[in-house]
């Protein structure tokens, strides 16, 4: 028997079946680095319209986690897809390098500044530590396949950036947004520093809940207000609080002007409460026998005075809109030094902003004999005992409530009035302008707009000063006596910035005031405070984007971070940009959810459900991680687990196998010589290219809308359904058995070439390593890298006016599906082995029959059977299977007649009819020794 294997065009490619990504990717990265791929892309895109995604800087502390990976991969997908869409999209990664976490790490190793090291040496150690952390994180980000200017990232500790941060503050001061005040701010006693809003988390805490009586000074005046005379015992106004430790700072009692307040007789005293809360208060304090003697509006009680239970002074009743009937007594303990609402109303009434608490959280000397030097969180019991002793405590119980805590230490924080510098939200209209700017930004998902609007509308002034060592100095001089800023502040700040640009922030601390102020130096002091690190990152639109040459003066198009950054980076950037320039720093803001495990639980080392990106890359490869990110809807929580990553790996194999099939069947194809014109191609091949064209339209729309999970779903549908289970199956016969250089085969290869050119580009933003690998195996002249090009423009489709248009082939797909069901049943019943052992008769109603008949003998190639006949629907025998999908179709199957051709495996009656090739069928004889078969349709 002759061996006809050599006459077949069997698929052949060096592109490996297995991805082996974990081993292969590092080699590709080395090539990208050696070639300066990022530089090649920049050169190729020079002069194109720009798209700038400004990198929100991760903190330079610790290894990257799965959340970092999600963030950087999403950014990279966008930057690469924009490049393919014809944009110049430079990506400059950055790091946030100042601040407390780095200080704490350095303190752990070297002690606090001033112990073993001077403050200058301590800062140098912080800089050194941050640089080491940047290097570690950079390696992992590069390993993810993220392309960017990794050799020249921006660091907030770069001297030039530090100088520009000072300049940003100068601009804000020049625009009139800065003010100083002894204002209550979030204060962490462990950090010994003020905290920004974004540095506060809320946890449940158990505190004493107390009702306290403040006795009236002028009892008769109160009786007159309530129009009563028969009161038994003293009259008191009752407050409720869960922070007894703040009572030493009490300077007033706030009541609501429009609420009704009742005078209630209980035993041998009378108390004043909001009328609507009388019943709940009586239940709480265990009183069943009480009488309401009279009621008045809160406004009637304004400025009446009451005795502080133990501090020895009296306090006024004042009117406040912040008083509610949600809980308590309707009268609010007011300590202007310990709360923002209290502070605001205190300013209105000219109250003292008392702050009896030191930076370490202990009462200052002279507060109260039994409280001096006591930690405030240990003082609650002492205060409760004091109130009991004075007869002012009506009730005490334990209560669990949500309490602000430090994001680093997870310990409770306090509000504490300290002299601080603030960016005012209202003195120059910053709040109003910011709210206006928010409306001009596209928020993705769109609920982000309402979220940040609410935060901006309700946020307090921004406390930007910190009492730390490792941070950008505020670089201000204030008068020793008046505490006013120097009249030449902006000029002086520019002088400081110039020095910092050369020597870094240490230049400020080394500066002798006389160098800049001359004879005035004795009248001024250098402000020792540093800037909140959120000011560092929030000003990068100015300190980085505005000055980097590759951004050419363009503002950022997009900021992309986790959804917690509405109150973090998005907020600080908006505040600073609006305060400096009167406009938002971004056009689009995209947020992604947090990563959770397969059961939807938060990632936690204690639970042991964390997924390490380094482990995933070492086991499965970065492309699997990238595919997981892209295929997950990032607008909600993003679930990741070994099982979920395994599913991503399965999807990857389907895409890789499709690419490999295309490459293997393009063996020997030279697009410069072998391309078949569209009008001369087999109709099915033109349909396949049209499928790619339709898929590309969907995929490009999804990339444009940042719907990457839609990109992956459409890509999978194209590979699995349109190609894998239909087209690629059908063409194997023609591809393998036709004459190598025949139009029938070259038509098929032309289609595969167009599809491969499109597919490799669709993959590139997501499966960057695999796309680069595929690119290297594609035939024809091309640029070295897929990333320098644009979406493929060589696709075309069938015209609707053609008889065999897309609708025709869509119906054929359904017919093929129905035939497959019948064949599968026949195989299960052991009637046939494979589909080529079968012959089918399609009993069809006239319209469908005409379409099927139009394919002639080529219908069998579409159905993958050795025979296919079309007959009238009404002639169908009883055993013909009625289609569930196509009402006008029945399918009958029989065993194919004739012998099996060993070359094409079809069963035909003409095997051995040609003496010279006695073992093969007539079609194969033509393909081996004749002019080759002609294919028109399939």
UniProtKB/Swiss-Prot annotation:
Q: Report the GO terms under cellular component.
A: cytosol
Signal peptide range equals none
GO molecular function terms here?
Answer: aminoacyl-tRNA deacylase activity; ATP binding; isoleucine-tRNA ligase activity; tRNA binding; zinc ion binding
Query: InterPro entries under this entry?
Result: aa-tRNA-synth_I_CS, aa-tRNA-synth_Ia, Anticodon_Ile_BEm, Ile-tRNA-ligase, Ile-tRNA-ligase_type1, Ile-tRNA_ligase, M/V/L/I-tRNA-synth_anticd-bd, Rossmann-like_a/b/a_fold
Xref: PANTHER family: ISOLEUCINE--TRNA LIGASE, MITOCHONDRIAL, SOLEUCYL-TRNA SYNTHETASE
Its localization reads: Cytoplasm
Q: Which Pfam families match?
A: Anticodon_1, tRNA-synt_1, zf-FPG_IleRS
The top EC class is ligase
Lineage at the top is: Bacteria, Pseudomonadati, Pseudomonadota, Gammaproteobacteria, Enterobacterales
- Function field: Catalyzes the attachment of isoleucine to tRNA(Ile). As IleRS can inadvertently accommodate and process structurally similar amino acids such as valine, to avoid such errors it has two additional distinct tRNA(Ile)-dependent editing activities. One activity is designated as 'pretransfer' editing and involves the hydrolysis of activated Val-AMP. The other activity is designated 'posttransfer' editing and involves deacylation of mischarged Val-tRNA(Ile).
The answer to whether the entry has keyword Cytoplasm is yes
* Positions that bind ATP: 605
Name the major location. cytoplasm
Task: Indicate which residues form the motif 'HIGH' region.
Answer: 58-68
Note the NCBIfam families from the entry. Answer: ileS
Which residues are recorded as modified (N6-acetyllysine)?
183
Q: Which residues bind L-isoleucyl-5'-AMP?
A: 561
Q: How is the cofactor bound?
A: Binds 1 zinc ion per subunit.
Task: Quote the record's binding site residues for Zn(2+).
Answer: 901, 904, 921, 924
Q: What name is this protein filed under?
A: Isoleucine--tRNA ligase
Motif range ('KMSKS' region): 602-606
């Amino acid at each position: 028997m002759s061996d006809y294997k050599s006459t077949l065009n069997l698929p052949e490619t060096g592109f490996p079946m297995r991805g082996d990504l974990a081993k292969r990717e590092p080699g590709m990265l080395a090539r990208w680095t050696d070639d300066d791929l990022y530089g090649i892309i920049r050169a190729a895109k020079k002069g194109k319209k720009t798209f700038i995604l400004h990198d929100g800087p991760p903190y330079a502390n610790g290894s990257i986690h799965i959340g970092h990976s999600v963030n950087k991969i999403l950014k990279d997908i966008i930057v690469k897809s924009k490049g393919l869409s014809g944009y110049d999209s430079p990506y400059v990664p950055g790091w946030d390098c100042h601040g407390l976490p780095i200080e704490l790490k350095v303190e752990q190793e070297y002690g606090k500044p001033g112990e073993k090291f001077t403050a200058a040496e301590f800062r140098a150690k912080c800089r050194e530590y941050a640089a080491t952390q940047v290097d570690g994180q950079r390696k992992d980000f590069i390993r993810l396949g993220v392309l960017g200017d990794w050799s020249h990232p921006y660091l907030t500790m770069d001297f030039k950036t530090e100088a520009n941060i000072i300049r940003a503050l100068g601009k804000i001061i020049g625009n009139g947004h800065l003010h100083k005040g002894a204002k209550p701010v979030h204060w962490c006693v462990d950090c010994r520093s003020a905290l920004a809003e974004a540095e506060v988390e809320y946890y449940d805490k158990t505190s004493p809940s107390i009702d306290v009586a403040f006795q009236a000074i002028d009892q008769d005046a109160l009786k007159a207000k309530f129009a009563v005379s028969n009161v038994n015992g003293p009259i008191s106004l009752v407050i409720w609080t869960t922070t007894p430790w703040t009572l030493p700072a009490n300077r007033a009692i706030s009541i609501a002007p429009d609420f009704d307040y009742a005078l209630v007789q209980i035993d041998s005293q009378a108390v004043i409460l909001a009328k609507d809360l009388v019943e709940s208060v009586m239940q709480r304090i265990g009183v069943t026998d009480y009488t309401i003697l009279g009621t008045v509006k809160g406004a009637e009680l304004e400025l009446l005075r009451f005795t502080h239970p133990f501090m020895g002074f009296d306090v006024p009743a004042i009117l406040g809109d912040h008083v509610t009937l949600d809980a308590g007594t309707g009268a609010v303990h007011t300590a202007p030094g310990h709360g923002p609402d209290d502070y605001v109303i205190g300013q209105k009434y000219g109250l003292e902003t008392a702050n009896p608490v030191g930076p370490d959280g202990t009462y200052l000397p002279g507060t109260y004999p039994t409280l001096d030097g006591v930690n405030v969180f240990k003082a609650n019991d002492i205060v409760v005992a004091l109130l009991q002793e004075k007869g002012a405590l009506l009730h005490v119980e334990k209560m669990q409530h949500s309490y602000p805590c430090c994001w680093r230490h997870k310990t409770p924080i306090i509000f504490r009035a300290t002299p601080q510098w603030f960016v005012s939200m209202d003195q120059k209209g910053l709040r109003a302008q910011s709210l206006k700017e928010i409306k001009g930004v596209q928020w993705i998902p769109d609920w982000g707009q309402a979220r940040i609007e609410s935060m901006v509308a309700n946020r307090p002034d921004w406390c930007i000063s910190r009492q730390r060592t490792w941070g950008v100095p505020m670089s201000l001089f204030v008068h020793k006596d008046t505490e006013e800023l120097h009249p030449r502040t902006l000029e002086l700040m520019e002088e400081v910035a110039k020095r910092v640009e050369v020597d870094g922030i240490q230049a400020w601390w080394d500066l002798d005031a006389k160098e800049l102020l001359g004879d005035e130096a004795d009248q001024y002091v250098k402000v020792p405070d540093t800037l909140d690190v959120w000011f560092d990152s929030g000003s990068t639109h100015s300190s980085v984007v505005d000055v980097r040459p590759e951004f050419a003066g363009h503002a950022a198009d997009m900021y992309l971070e986790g959804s917690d950054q509405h109150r973090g980076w998005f907020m600080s950037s908006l505040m600073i940009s609006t305060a400096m320039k009167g406009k938002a720093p971004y056009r689009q803001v995209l947020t992604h959810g947090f990563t959770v495990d397969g059961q939807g639980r938060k990632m936690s080392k204690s639970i042991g459900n964390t997924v390490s990106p380094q482990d995933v890359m070492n086991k499965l490869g970065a492309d699997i991680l990238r595919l997981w990110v892209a295929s997950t809807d990032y607008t909600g929580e993003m679930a990741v687990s070994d099982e979920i990553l395994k599913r991503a790996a399965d999807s990857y194999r389907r895409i890789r196998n499709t690419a490999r099939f295309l490459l293997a069947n393009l063996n020997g194809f030279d697009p410069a010589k072998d391309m078949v014109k569209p009008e001369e191609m087999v109709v099915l091949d033109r349909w396949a290219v049209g499928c790619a064209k339709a898929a590309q339209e969907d995929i490009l729309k999804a990339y444009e809308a940042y719907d990457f999970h839609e990109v992956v779903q459409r890509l999978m549908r194209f590979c699995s359904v349109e190609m894998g289970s239909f087209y690629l199956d059908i063409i194997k016969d023609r591809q393998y058995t036709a004459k190598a250089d025949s139009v029938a085969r070259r038509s098929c290869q032309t289609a595969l070439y167009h599809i491969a050119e499109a597919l490799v580009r669709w993959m590139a933003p997501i499966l960057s390593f695999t796309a680069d690998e595929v690119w290297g195996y594609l035939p024809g002249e091309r640029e070295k890298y897929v990333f320098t090009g644009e979406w493929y423009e060589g696709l075309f489709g069938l015209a609707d006016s053609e008889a065999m248009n897309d609708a025709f082939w869509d119906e054929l797909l359904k017919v093929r599906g129905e035939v497959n069901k019948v064949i599968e049943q026949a195989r299960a019943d052991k009637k046939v082995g494979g589909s080529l052992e079968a012959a089918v008769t399609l009993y069809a109603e006239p319209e469908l029959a005409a379409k099927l008949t139009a394919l002639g003998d080529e219908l069998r190639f579409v159905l993958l059977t050795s025979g296919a006949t079309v007959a009238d629907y009404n002639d169908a025998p009883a055993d013909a299977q009625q289609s569930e999908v196509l009402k006008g179709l029945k399918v009958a199957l029989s065993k194919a007649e004739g012998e099996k051709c060993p070359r094409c495996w079809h069963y035909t009656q003409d095997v051995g009819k040609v003496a010279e090739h006695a073992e093969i069928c007539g079609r194969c004889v033509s393909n081996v020794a004749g002019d080759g078969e002609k294919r028109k349709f399939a």
